[in-house]
Amino acid sequence: MKVSPRRRARECAVQALYSWYISQNSIEEVELAFVTDQDMKGVDLPYFRKLLRGTALYVEAIDHDIRPYLDRMENDVDPIERTILRLATYELKYELDVPYKVVINEGIEVAKVFGSDDSHKYINGILDKLAPALGRK
């Protein structure tokens, strides 16, 4: 099955945001390195950039929104799960043209690709509670 350009943008954004989180480099450095080094064929590049930059720009507000729905301390959340939650929360909060059900489903699907065995269930549980709190249900 062919993966949509937006799904590819989300997958790439998760990888780049994870790199940003781990490396502590600027988002501009991470973006440049990512688009230079990775195969960006089939990626909605403008959407990738919007997700990457937007999530990085609003990361403190996003973390504040996510925090009440975590079942553990923020630093105990797996870094890839945290990154997926940040990206999906950015979309729920700031990309209002994307239906909330699509955002949740995409978060689940990206977690199936990058997360551990049960990551998608954890992501689903949090996003399902977070969406109404952000006025998206």
From Swiss-Prot:
Q: Which UniProt keywords apply?
A: RNA-binding, Transcription, Transcription antitermination, Transcription regulation
Q: Is Transcription included in the keywords of this UniProt record?
A: yes
InterPro entries in the cross-refs: NusB-like_sf, NusB_fam, NusB_RsmB_TIM44
Tell me the GO BP annotations in alphabetical order.
DNA-templated transcription termination; transcription antitermination
Q: Which GO terms describe its cellular component?
A: cytosol
Q: Which Pfam families match?
A: NusB (PF01029)
Do you know which CDD domains this protein is assigned to?
Terminator_NusB (cd00619)
Any one GO MF annotation of this record: RNA binding
Which SUPFAM superfamilies would you find in this protein's record? NusB-like
Q: Which domain of life is it from?
A: Bacteria
Q: NCBIfam families from the entry?
A: nusB
What family does this chain come from, according to its entry? Belongs to the NusB family.
Function summary? Involved in transcription antitermination. Required for transcription of ribosomal RNA (rRNA) genes. Binds specifically to the boxA antiterminator sequence of the ribosomal RNA (rrn) operons.
The protein depicted here goes by the name Transcription antitermination protein NusB
* Organism of this sequence: Haemophilus ducreyi (strain 35000HP / ATCC 700724)
Q: Which gene encodes it?
A: nusB
